[in-house]
Amino acid sequence: MAAATGLEEAVAPMGALCGLVQDFVMGQQEGPADQVAADVKSGGYTVLQVVEALGSSLENAEPRTRARGAQLLSQVLLQCHSLLSEKEVVHLILFYENRLKDHHLVVPSVLQGLRALSMSVALPPGLAVSVLKAIFQEVHVQSLLQVDRHTVFSIITNFMRSREEELKGLGADFTFGFIQVMDGEKDPRNLLLAFRIVHDLISKDYSLGPFVEELFEVTSCYFPIDFTPPPNDPYGIQREDLILSLRAVLASTPRFAEFLLPLLIEKVDSEILSAKLDSLQTLNACCAVYGQKELKDFLPSLWASIRREVFQTASERVEAEGLAALHSLTACLSCSVLRADAEDLLGSFLSNILQDCRHHLCEPDMKLVWPSAKLLQAAAGASARACEHLTSNVLPLLLEQFHKHSQSNQRRTILEMILGFLKLQQKWSYEDRDERPLSSFKDQLCSLVFMALTDPSTQLQLVGIRTLTVLGAQPGLLSAEDLELAVGHLYRLTFLEEDSQSCRVAALEASGTLATLYPGAFSRHLLPKLAEELHKGESDVARADGPTKCSRHFRCLQALSAVSTHPSIVKETLPLLLQHLCQANKGNMVTESSEVVAVCQSLQQVAEKCQQDPESYWYFHKTAVPCLFALAVQASMPEKESSVLRKVLLEDEVLAALASVIGTATTHLSPELAAQSVTCIVPLFLDGNTSFLPENSFPDQFQPFQDGSSGQRRLVALLTAFVCSLPRNVEIPQLNRLMRELLKQSCGHSCPFSSTAATKCFAGLLNKQPPGQQLEEFLQLAVGTVEAGLASESSRDQAFTLLLWVTKALVLRYHPLSACLTTRLMGLLSDPELGCAAADGFSLLMSDCTDVLTRAGHADVRIMFRQRFFTDNVPALVQGFHAAPQDVKPNYLKGLSHVLNRLPKPVLLPELPTLLSLLLEALSCPDSVVQLSTLSCLQPLLLEAPQIMSLHVDTLVTKFLNLSSSYSMAVRIAALQCMHALTRLPTSVLLPYKSQVIRALAKPLDDKKRLVRKEAVSARGEWFLLGSPGS
């Protein structure tokens, strides 16, 4: 009985398998194949059992039945090939090889089975060769469908990947067999595979035997690629994919050179732009593989074709590719090793280039002068030898032409060509200065440059400045006398009149570059002149002379900062600038805030330049920072007769400029040096310790946190700049006391500048404070101060500012308390007094600051804080908007608009459908800030989410047109930009509104503001073109 039960259990699965096979083969159902494969993978059946169940189907007299049987077996093998044993693979391959001779209906399924077996790790040695021989012999690949041809290429690819040595054993027969398979292929999907196979044949050193030309012919027949992908191509194959794949084949071996180069020359000389580009790019790629031997016979023809394209083409792309090809050709010839008796192909090639180009450099009309120069420079840039050969021949000619031509624009053209050759010289190093090709021309070059610098033409002066910079960058070309003259010219150009600003800027930039290389020359010849100019400027400002004198003074400040590019020069310019401030502080000048701000800007630029050199940076910090603090402290002291400047130094704008200098001079300090500085500056503010300040005999104590004057309290802005720029790991002395004093000042004084400075300082330090008990104590104090301040009529504004900055400090670092503080901020949106400010506060929370809480100042700023803030708070803002009274809704809209406007667009797009209605409502808000913020948010969305925006086109058109008449110029401009962006929506959606929009946009064409008119013209033009052919 038990034996009978076991027999039934064995028979039952086979019966189920036969049923599935029958359903697939005879019932034409596809599902059973996956079921059989799943059962084989789970161990329900073996592959042998599947073959047995298919027995009658595989032997059936009807080809379609045999094909279905083979198809089922192949589909199972494609999913289960990893489970096969070596013995099973052998039997299956013998079976499939035999069936390659079967009816043409059966062959595609057989090929699928062989593809599965080509991926099996159990494939015994020798069978890969056997399979490929059978395919090459029995299968007429060209008669197969695309998918079946793709299968053949896949089999070859799999075997080349796993059985390389076996296939190489076939020798050239494998290459010949593959040529037969590839011949006549047209489908781009298959060609990509075929090109990779050919590339592997060559790169992996398979034997090509006598079939090199045949292999070239079977691939080059596709050159140049003219494939255009169909619309909505599901395969994603682009023309560029095929071009690059074919190019990799054609440029993979020098053995193709004798066949390929004539083809490239023919295509370059054709009239088809794409063929020219493809051929030149392919030639460029070939030069990396070829040598002189391959190029020798084709050089005259290649040069003639390239020259013609550069001289005659109307396409900048063809010109650029032609020049790149010439560069590569010259580099290839330069790299080849010459035998003693070999012909110097590089020399003769360069001589041909010179012969065909040099006479164009001398033509009076200078018609082909630029194309000739470009060709010469493309070749010269390829190697040191080419550069030396061409430069030594061309430079004398160009120098002669410069003197022959008297017009400034012609001289400018020639000098620009000379500049091109000078730049090329910088690529190559020469151990011996006398070997430099430019050494014999240096006197003529310097003379020519100085002529250009004194020419009335601004454009020629600009080229002269650039040429001087390049000359100076090459050692040994500028003598001491040349340098003195050069510095004199740069000094003169720095003080040119207003209409020569471009020359002034270029002169300043050149001075900075050359001062790095020749600090001694600039120290001797320029700094004394600038010091004298600065002293004259002091007296000019004191006499309140005309704007010309003042502008010279400002230019002098710019020049001092521009040349501060070398440590030795910084040690001279920094004292000059600081002394200039000190002179003003002594009351010797009638000074305006703009003057002090200008000096501070120069100091900041010097500090930025010093950041690259730690030693120079520390010198700047230890020299400038104490001096600036001393000046500010002196200015804050009560005096019977305070100077005008002392009052100026305490103005908001000037303190902000001083703070920027101090911050810039601190951010790059090492922790060790920063620790030295912080032990002096914090006690200055907490204890009035002025001992480290220069000239520290002050008439009164400095106590900004006690009962000091309002002027002293304002200097907390400078403390903020310093401590909020320190590295996070620098310990701040008396931190607990400092934080309490800052908190006290943030809500304890009526001066907004002082209280905001203290608030920012508190927030900056809070952000950097490591987690722990001390941080929690500071937070408790801050929250208590905020709540107490909000409850008091006299300090509500200061308390709100504190809430805002503390919230930002915590949002940036993902602190849990930030959620509670943000909720508190949202609650204030309904406050009659603070609601509008609370809405604007969301802009601060989402924006990057420039003074505190910056990454440059070492603040703890998490990368995705905006995304997190959006996710955590926008739902509450939306909910609050819906629940708020009508008069409060604008505040919620403003807050929401600020958040969305500063959110990365990829984060906003998925949420757009739910938020768009609110954004549209925000456009109706009377607040111009809300309107502008919302328009700024919507404009990129019109470009990036046209399908969603199309659903609201009626509302968008109406609201944008209304806002194009807003009283705010910024809103009008933004609305017109959105009208322009609307044209990116589907044309069919926009056409019903075309005439309405064109009429409405006629009004802003007459706007009184030029920028509004400009946007109106642009937008109206795009709407006019809607629906026209080619739009």
From Swiss-Prot:
Record PTM Phosphoserine, positions in chain: 1028
Range of residues in the leader sequence: none
N-acetylalanine: residues carrying this PTM: 2
Reported phenotype of the disruption mutant: Embryonically lethality before the implantation stage.
InterPro entries registered for this protein in UniProt: ARM-like, ARM-type_fold, MMS19, MMS19_C, MMS19_N
Source superkingdom: Eukaryota
Tissues with expression: Ubiquitously expressed with higher expression in testis.
Subcellular location: Nucleus; Cytoplasm, Cytoskeleton, Spindle
Cellular compartments per GO CC: cytoplasm; cytosolic [4Fe-4S] assembly targeting complex; MMXD complex; nucleoplasm; nucleus; spindle
GO terms classed as biological process: chromosome segregation; DNA repair; protein maturation
Keywords of the record: Acetylation, Activator, Chromosome partition, Cytoplasm, Cytoskeleton, DNA damage, DNA repair, Nucleus, Phosphoprotein, Repeat, Transcription, Transcription regulation, Ubl conjugation
SUPFAM superfamilies according to UniProt: ARM repeat (SSF48371)
Gene3D superfamilies linked: Leucine-rich Repeat Variant
Post-translational note: Ubiquitinated; undergoes 'Lys-48'-linked polyubiquitination.
HEAT repeats: 867-905, 909-947, 950-988, 991-1029
GO molecular function, one term: nuclear estrogen receptor binding
Family per record: Belongs to the MET18/MMS19 family.
Complexes and interactors: Component of the CIA complex. In the CIA complex, interacts directly with CIAO2B and CIAO3. Component of the MMXD complex, composed of CIAO1, ERCC2, CIAO2B, MMS19 and SLC25A5. Interacts with CIAO2B; the interaction is direct. Interacts with ERCC2/XPD; the interaction is direct. Interacts with ERCC3/XPB and NCOA3/RAC3. Interacts with RTEL1; the interaction mediates the association of RTEL1 with the CIA complex. Interacts with BRIP1.
Role description: Key component of the cytosolic iron-sulfur protein assembly (CIA) complex, a multiprotein complex that mediates the incorporation of iron-sulfur cluster into apoproteins specifically involved in DNA metabolism and genomic integrity. In the CIA complex, MMS19 acts as an adapter between early-acting CIA components and a subset of cellular target Fe/S proteins such as ERCC2/XPD, FANCJ and RTEL1, thereby playing a key role in nucleotide excision repair (NER), homologous recombination-mediated double-strand break DNA repair, DNA replication and RNA polymerase II (POL II) transcription.
UniProt name for this protein: MMS19 nucleotide excision repair protein homolog
Organism annotation: Mus musculus
Taxonomic lineage: Eukaryota, Metazoa, Chordata, Craniata, Vertebrata
Chain's gene name: Mms19
